[in-house]
Each structure stands twice: as C-alpha cells, then as structure tokens.
Design a protein with these regions (language model features):
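Membrane-embedded alpha-helical bundles of multi-pass transporters/translocases
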Residues: 1-502
Length: 502
C-alpha cells in the first residue's frame, strides 16, 4: 500500500506539473495569438495529426499492447515479451509513417473537410501548419509504445515526466523565439517537443531490461489486432467529437480557438486527478485479469472508482461556481479580450457538467480492456459518436458554441453510464451500498458549490486588480473544498479506511 501511494503520489505531482505547464503553454499562445484567425488555423492544424493519431493508434497502443505484453511476460518470459514488443513497435512505426505521408499529401482536403468554415488566408495557413506538424503522428506513436512498455515493467516515473519536456519546449520557444519565427516556429516547437518525449524514454527502457530485437512480425500481433480493432472504435469518441465540434465551430466567430481553450483547460483539470490513478491501475487490472484474480480485480476497480468520484465532485463544483474568473485568470491578457473570455468561459461552464463522467469513463474503458473485452466499449462509442453528431447539430443551433460544449458533456455521461451498467452486470464490482456514497458525494458537492459561490460573492469588494481576483478566487476555492473535505472526514470514515486497505 505504501509503495502504491508513493508511486501514485509521484505520478500525480508529475502529471500536475505537466498539466500546469501545458496550461501555461496555452496561456502564452492565447496571449500571443488571441482567439482570431491565426489561432483558429493553428488549432485546426494541430488537432488534425493528434486526432488521427488518437483514432488510428493511441488506444490500440495503450490499451491493447499492455495486456498482450503482460501475458507474454507472465507466461513465456521476458525474452519472448521483448520480441513481441519489438515487432509491435516496428509495425506501429511503419503504420504511422504511412498515415503521416497521406495526411501531408492531402492536407488541403483534410482541412477543407475538418474545418469547412476556414477560408482564404486562414485556410491556407492551416494547410501549411498541418504539413509541418504531421510527423507528430510518428513521434506520438513511438512515445506511447515506450510509455506502455515502461509501465508494464513497473516504471511509472519517466512516462509521467515526459510531457513536461514537450510543454517546456513550446514555452521556451514563445518566450525567446516567437518574435523571429511566429506561428510557423510554434508548429516546429510542438513537433520537436513530441520528438523529445520519445527520445528521453529510450535510456529508461534499456535500464529496465528491454532489449530491442529486429523482429518485424510476431504471432502476438494477431492478438493485438483482435483486441485493438474494437478498442480503436471504442476510443474514437474523443478525437471524432473534436473533429465534429471543430467543423461546427469553424463557422462561428472565434469558434475553434475559444472551444479549444475551454476544452483543453477542462481536460487538463480532469486528467490531473484521474490519469495518475488510471495509469497506475490499468497494468494492475491487466495482471489481476491475466491471473484470474477476480476478487482483487473487483476491489481495485471499486476503490479506484470511488477515488475518482470523490476527487472530481468538488472540482466540478468549483468549475461551475467560478468558470468566468478561472478563465479570466488563466487567459485574459494580451490579445485575449473580453469577448474571448465570454465565449471561452461559457463553453468551460457547460463542459464542466461532464467532468465526473469523463473521469470515470477512462477507468471503465481500461477495466474492459484489462479483461481483453473491447466489444462493449466499441459499440458504446459508435452510439456516442452518432449521438454527438445529432446533439451538436441541434444544440449549436440553440446555444452556439455553448451547445457544442454541452453536447460533449452529455455524450460523456451517456458513455460512462452505459459502460458502468454493462461492467457492473458482468463483474458486480459496485453494490447498492457503494452507490449510496455516490449520492452523498453529489450532495456534498452541491453544498460545496453554494459555499464557493457565496464566498466569492461576499468578497466582491476586494476584486480591484488581477492579483486580488486571484486571491478572491483562491479563498473561494479553499472554502468550497474545505467544506467538502469536512463532510468526507466526518461522514465517510468507513470509506477512508476501505481505501487505505485497498
């Protein structure tokens, strides 16, 4: 238990630092380029290779590779495991090069399809930036391969640190070199950052015993394909939803950039408090499933579920209560003015309703993948994509950019609830008694929201500068989280003891 706490604690700190730097990066971009045409072109271009990577490779690597690799390590030894890993890495590398070449050749067509609202110079700029950033697909694929390999070997520290390097590269560029190279240099800086993420993991992989083999085919690749195809479909919801929202938002003034600023902050907040848990738990669930340790699997899953819910409920309350001051503090400077704040804060507010569902969705997906069951997540994702398309169309007509954010939140809720029901029906990891905690956590969260909003309103006379706004917002956050924490300590002692055991 102590080792687990230390590992997850270190991962949390590193992920927190990484996400903070990621948000600092977004703050610099917002301040330098605002929420206009240049920013729209950059986000349309940068999202293309990243979304294609997510659609084709990301979850196949992180969710299909780890269970199969662990199976070979446990049953056939390290040598055979490394042969499988080498064959997998080589296959992924070749596939990512082919996808990158296709995107570079047809970049104009891709931008036209994915961001039809961009015209003239903005469209042309997006095409040029896409060509520059397309090799990110190759570096991201290799980065994910080595991160999965290291996590399977029990090395969580290096994968948790690598994003710090790439975010730092972009920040350094904006501070020191942006005045010379502008938006094109920013695209190259992002590309270099992804390359560094891959390179820094190679020494750690060697240190942890991985030995690369010149293997271009391994029988285990068939197992990966069987698991990966439905996994890919199951994880299409995030990138395809991004593409749908960008396509709709491109017809709105400052739509793409405002939606991106809001969604990235929302995803950063969620990831900080969930990724450290799910990244640690997934290899553990995979091993428990491979060893047919059903009781251990259920206990690990239930404890992880409760931790994520307990942490995200007060975060959701803070985001709902303080969405506008949060956006003002994070983004409002330079080219990012009042109108951009209004649009981004509104989108951030509606995104916030989905943060709890988004957090548990990641855990539930990985719980299915640990059992080598990817059919149910795949079917759910297909339904969710269709739902998102319909909801985005109608809600955009009613609410503009805010409707796109609400659509995303509702889709996450649909997926999380569907997967929860399906998984609990199969393994019975969550009882009615456990469900009482969820209801109580929501009640505590509502009280926290009221307290946070009340304190923020009471402190309005001191809000006369940026520094005092930060102080006002900080005090309100502490008050809201403090009340929630008191409820947990006073009324959930049994839960705290249970989590310590697991």
């Amino acid at each position: 238990m102590n080792k687990a706490i230390k590992t997850v604690g270190f991962m949390f700190i590193m992920i927190l630092l990484s996400k903070v730097l990621g948000q600092v990066r977004e703050m610099f971009i917002a301040s330098t380029f605002g929420a206009g045409g240049i920013a729209d072109a950059y986000y349309a271009a940068s999202s293309l290779p990243l979304n294609l990577f997510d659609i084709v490779f990301a979850s196949a690597i992180s969710s299909a590779f780890i269970p199969v690799y662990n199976t070979y390590i446990e049953k056939e030894g390290i040598e055979e495991g490394d042969r499988f890993a080498s064959g997998f890495i080589n296959t992924i590398f070749l596939g990512s090069v082919i996808i990158s070449a296709i995107l570079m050749i047809f970049s104009d067509l891709f931008i036209y399809i994915m961001a039809p609202g961009l015209h003239g110079d903005v469209h042309n700029l997006a095409v040029k930036l896409t060509i520059i950033m397309t090799p990110i697909i190759v570096f991201a694929s290799l980065t994910f391969c080595f991160s999965g390999l290291l996590q399977s070997k029990g090395e969580f520290n290096v994968p948790a640190v690598i994003s710090i390097i790439s975010n730092s590269a972009v920040i350094i560029y904006i501070i020191f070199f942006n005045k010379y190279f502008g938006i094109y240099g920013l695209a190259f800086a992002l590309l270099i950052g992804w390359g560094l993420q891959f390179l820094v993991q190679i020494p750690s992989a060697h240190k942890n015993g991985f030995r690369y083999k010149r293997v271009f085919y391994h029988k285990g690749l068939k197992d990966v394909v069987k698991l990966a195809l439905p996994v890919l479909v199951g994880t299409w919801i995030q990138p395809i939803s991004n593409m749908i929202n960008n396509a709709y938002a491109s017809s709105l003034d400052k739509g793409i950039s405002s939606l991106n600023y809001a969604s990235k902050l929302y995803l950063i907040v969620s990831a900080v408090f969930t990724v450290s848990v799910t990244n640690y738990v997934f290899p553990l669930l995979s091993k428990q499933s491979a060893l047919e340790d059903k009781d251990g699997y259920k206990k690990t899953l239930c404890a992880s579920f409760k931790i994520i819910v307990a942490v995200l409920v007060p975060i959701c309350a803070l985001m709902l209560a303080l969405h506008t001051p949060i956006i003002e503090i994070v983004y409002k400077r330079g080219e990012f003015g009042d109108e951009a704040v209004r649009l981004t804060a509104g989108a951030f507010y509606w995104y916030s309703f989905g943060i709890i569902f988004y957090g548990v969705l990641d855990l539930l997906n990985k719980a299915f993948y640990a059992q080598k069951n990817s059919i149910i997540p795949a079917i759910t994702a297909v339904c969710a994509i269709a739902l998102n398309f319909v909801l985005s169309y109608f809600l955009k007509s009613l609410m503009g950019i805010y409707g796109l954010a609400l659509s995303a939140a509702l889709v996450y809720a649909f997926m999380a609830i569907t997967l929860f029901i399906a998984l609990n029906k199969k393994v019975r990891f969550f009882s009615l008694k456990d469900g009482v905690f969820f209801i109580k956590a929501i009640i505590y969260g509502i009280v926290s929201l009221i307290v946070t909003k009340g304190v923020f309103t009471l402190l309005s006379p001191i809000d006369t500068s940026v520094l005092l706004k930060i102080v006002r917002t900080g005090i309100s956050c502490v008050a809201g989280v403090g009340v929630y924490g008191i409820f947990i300590i006073l009324f959930e002692r049994k839960l705290i003891k249970e989590l310590k055991k697991n």
